[in-house]
Amino acid sequence: YGLLVGSECISRHLDMTDRSSCILFGDGAGAAVIELDDSRAYTSLFGCHGDLDVINCTNKAGERSLVHMEGQATYKFAVSTVPKLIESVVKKAGLTLDDIDVFICHQANARIVDAVARHLKLPKDKFFMNLHEYANTSAASLAIALSDAIEKGICKRGQTLLLTGFGAGKTWGAVVIDF
C-alpha cells in the first residue's frame, strides 16, 4: 500500500493586495490509500528542468515569504509540457488516449486544462475539473480532485485514470492507474 498525501496552507504566504496571485489559490488537504496490484503494470513519468533558479525563497529576517504567480509563463510551461507528458506516459503504459476514461490534471487554471484537452484532441468532459470549488490548492490539488471525482461518481471501479501534475521548480509528473 501507498499513501498519497498533499496539503497546502498557501494563504499564509499570499499578499492579499496582489490580485494577480491571491485570487488563484486556496488552502486544502487530500489523501488516498493506493494499493499496487502485482498483476498490473505501474506506469509513471516524472521530470524537471533541473534549474532551481525559478524557486527563490529568500527574504529578510522577520519578513514573510510571499508567493507570486507568473501566470503567462506558467501557462506556456504547462501547455507545452503536459500534453507531451500525457502522450508519453500513455505510450509507456501500452495504451492509447482513448483507453483513458478520466484525466485528472493539477487544478491550476481552467485555461490550461482546456488547452491540454484541445492539444490532445480530446473532449473536455474527459478532464475532471473542480477548480471552481477549491481554487488552486497547489500540492493538494490532485489528491483533492481524485477524492472529489470519486465522491461525485466520475471515477468508477474498473476505469483507467491518468493523474498529472506540474508545479514549482518546473517539475512535472503523471501516473496511469486502474481504479
Q: How would you describe each model-predicted region?
A:
Residues 1-22, 45-63, 108-118, 137-144:
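Active-site-adjacent elements of ketosynthase-type condensing enzymes
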Residues 1-2, 63-68, 147-156:
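A polyampholytic, Gly/Pro-enriched intrinsically disordered region
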Residues 1-3, 30-32, 40, 102, ...:
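Structural motif
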Residues 2-8, 34-35, 163-167:
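Short beta-strand segments
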Residues 16-80, 84-87, 166, 179:
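Condensing-enzyme catalytic core mediating Claisen C-C bond formation in acyl metabolism
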Residues 81-92, 115, 119, 145:
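Phosphate/ATP-binding catalytic cores across multiple sugar-kinase/actin-like superfamilies
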Residues 84-101, 149-154:
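Phosphate/pyrophosphate-binding loops at sites that engage ATP/ADP/AMP, CoA/4′-phosphopantetheine
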Residues 101-179:
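Claisen-condensing/thiolase-fold acyl-transfer catalytic domains that form or cleave C-C bonds
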